[in-house]
């Protein structure tokens, strides 16, 4: 838990500028300051409550909601319309605007996230940016990415992860925890990701953080990890449906890894397949299904992903772009014979031979 109250912090938030506004995901991110320190405030409109997916308190006292079907609720989309204005109509089509009944527990308007104090790394991650496709070779990983990972894995930067794993932070949100000091390798904790409002099962987004600390990212995986990943995948797809009373089934879960990850301690994302996005909204690289990783480790060779070239999207605000990826992409395009940024008026060169 943070040392200060969220409402108090937001009350002291001083607006500076809009970092990003996404009409598709219905998310806005603001840069500001609180008590003279940078802060990033993000608001995301919550998913609709509808009559067949209604939140009810858990009888067992679980920290996460339980969902039942075919129940009528006063805050559902249909019953919650309090005001309606028709914009226009044409034949069988009608358009309008509405106001829905809101309640902080049953039907909140938006999910709010605050990062404070926010570092330049956080700010750049949320800011609008141009994106590029990068082909990361093993040499690029060794010469550019590895030093960057070392910078990002200081005890101070990873403190929040260790707080979750060992200090009881966010225990009230934990969905599942498995840990034994005698078998640290198989231990992991599952809890809601900050992308989930914790209310609607259609937008379910969880993260499983492992206890073992010898794997920073996808790159560290090799065939020796294959059986471990198979066990992890099986446990996730068994535990999560049971926890939510099978309102989400095993084959409705997208279990995947990010590369580049947002932090370099191995973790797995667990998302309802109805969720519209899988984390690439801010140019965060690529996603690869855990089952595809498991299959690939069967034929990649003894060094696994360490010897594979990985192609993904990266934003110009990412430190890796500035630490050498920009120059490497330019070299690759030149090597491939692909022209970039022709001067205006030079015409289109059709000679591709």
Curated annotation (Swiss-Prot):
Sequence motif: Histidine triad motif, positions: 265-269
Induction field: By nutrient, osmotic, oxidative and heat stress. Up-regulated during the diauxic shift.
Region (Disordered): 333-353
Signal peptide start-end: none
Molecular-function GO terms, alphabetical: enzyme inhibitor activity; hydrolase activity; protein heterodimerization activity; protein homodimerization activity; RNA 7-methylguanosine cap binding
Record keyword Cytoplasm present: yes
Location in or out of the cell: Cytoplasm; Cytoplasm, Perinuclear region; Cytoplasm, P-body
Pfam families: DcpS (PF05652), DcpS_C (PF11969)
InterPro entries xref list: DcpS/DCS2 (IPR008594), Histidine_triad_CS (IPR019808), HIT-like_sf (IPR036265), Scavenger_mRNA_decap_enz_N (IPR011145)
Highest taxon, organism lineage: Eukaryota
Main location: cytoplasm
Biological process terms in GO annotation: cellular response to nutrient; cellular response to starvation; deadenylation-dependent decapping of nuclear-transcribed mRNA; nuclear-transcribed mRNA catabolic process; nuclear-transcribed mRNA catabolic process, nonsense-mediated decay; response to heat; response to nutrient; response to osmotic stress
Key words, A-Z: Cytoplasm, Nonsense-mediated mRNA decay, Phosphoprotein
Keyword Ion transport recorded: no
PTM annotation (Phosphoserine): residues: 341
GO cellular component, one term: nucleus
Coiled coil: none
Main function: Plays a role in the cleavage of a residual cap structure following the degradation of mRNAs by the 3'->5' exosome-mediated mRNA decay pathway. Stress-induced regulatory protein that modulates the m7GpppX diphosphatase activity of DCS1.
PANTHER family membership: HISTIDINE TRIAD HIT PROTEIN MEMBER (PTHR12978), M7GPPPX DIPHOSPHATASE (PTHR12978:SF0)
Leftover remarks: Present with 1870 molecules/cell in log phase SD medium.
Subunit annotation: Homodimer. Forms heterodimer with DCS2; the interaction inhibits the DCS1 scavenger decapping activity during post-diauxic growth.
Family: Belongs to the HIT family.
Protein name per its UniProtKB record: Inactive diphosphatase DCS2
Native organism: Saccharomyces cerevisiae (strain ATCC 204508 / S288c) (Baker's yeast)
Gene: DCS2
